């Protein structure tokens, strides 16, 4: 089953005080030109659920989308785009950081990276920052169609090797993804589905005395 199918827009917020009361959340984040909005639209099988722009940094707020199981997908502002006023950029950084560190409903992070340029400095900073939460991370190496099959295999292997220091201490996984070729949808569903199943199981198990 596609967890993201039929997702619908719920609300958008620009301050943590306006965060909605939700059960569980999966957040999507990435550099401003990594293909995050396209990945969300592909996973949800919706042409314009998340706005796709040729201008990086278009997502300027935290957008919530309700999934058919009642949980939520959260589209976070892209990072690394500097062509905005400093005050606006600082607000994005604080909003993003506070949400990732403080949001109790957040059970995992889907991090989108361009397969041609994975693990750039800001991506590594994001991994280091989120690592302190202990929550799982799944990386989508987007735009994989821009690489040959051999390049895809090589890139995936290299990224897995570079992630080893993180995966030794944290649940972190990575896959190839292409919005154009609809590549990797099932794998992303399985990974996120396992997070939701684990969270549901933990919530329903009796508390230890």
Curated annotation (Swiss-Prot):
Cofactor: Mg(2+)
Superkingdom classification of source: Bacteria
GO biological process: division septum assembly
GO cellular component entries: cytosol
Positions with a binding annotation for Mg(2+): 37, 59
Residue span, EngB-type G domain: 22-198
Short name of one Pfam family: MMR_HSR1
Keyword terms, alphabetized: Cell cycle, Cell division, GTP-binding, Magnesium, Metal-binding, Nucleotide-binding, Septation
One GO molecular-function entry: GTP binding
This protein's record includes keyword Zinc-finger: no
Function: Necessary for normal cell division and for the maintenance of normal septation.
Family (UniProt): Belongs to the TRAFAC class TrmE-Era-EngA-EngB-Septin-like GTPase superfamily. EngB GTPase family.
PANTHER family (alphabetical): ENGB-TYPE G DOMAIN-CONTAINING PROTEIN (PTHR11649:SF13), MSS1/TRME-RELATED GTP-BINDING PROTEIN (PTHR11649)
Protein name stated in the entry: Probable GTP-binding protein EngB
Organism of provenance: Neisseria meningitidis serogroup B (strain ATCC BAA-335 / MC58)
Primary gene name: engB
């Amino acid at each position: 089953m596609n967890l993201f199918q039929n997702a619908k827009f719920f609300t958008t917020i620009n301050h943590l005080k306006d965060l909605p009361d939700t059960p569980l959340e999966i957040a999507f984040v990435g550099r401003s030109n990594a293909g995050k909005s396209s990945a969300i639209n592909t996973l949800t099988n919706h042409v314009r659920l998340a706005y796709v722009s040729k201008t990086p940094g278009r997502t300027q707020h935290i957008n919530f989308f309700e999934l058919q199981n009642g949980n939520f997908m959260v589209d976070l502002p892209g990072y690394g785009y500097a062509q905005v006023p400093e005050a606006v950029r600082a607000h994005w950084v604080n909003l993003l950081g506070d949400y990732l560190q403080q949001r109790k409903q957040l059970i995992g992070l889907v991090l989108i990276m361009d397969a041609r340029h994975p693990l750039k400095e800001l991506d590594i900073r994001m991994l280091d920052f989120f690592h302190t939460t202990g929550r799982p991370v799944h990386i989508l190496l987007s735009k994989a169609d821009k690489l040959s099959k051999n390049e895809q295999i090589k890139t995936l292997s290299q990224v897995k090797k570079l992630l080893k220091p993180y995966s030794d201490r944290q649940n972190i996984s990575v896959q190839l993804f292409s919005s154009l070729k609809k590549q990797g949808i099932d794998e992303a569903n399985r990974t996120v589905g396992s997070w939701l199943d684990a969270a549901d199981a933990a919530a329903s198990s009796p508390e230890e005395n």
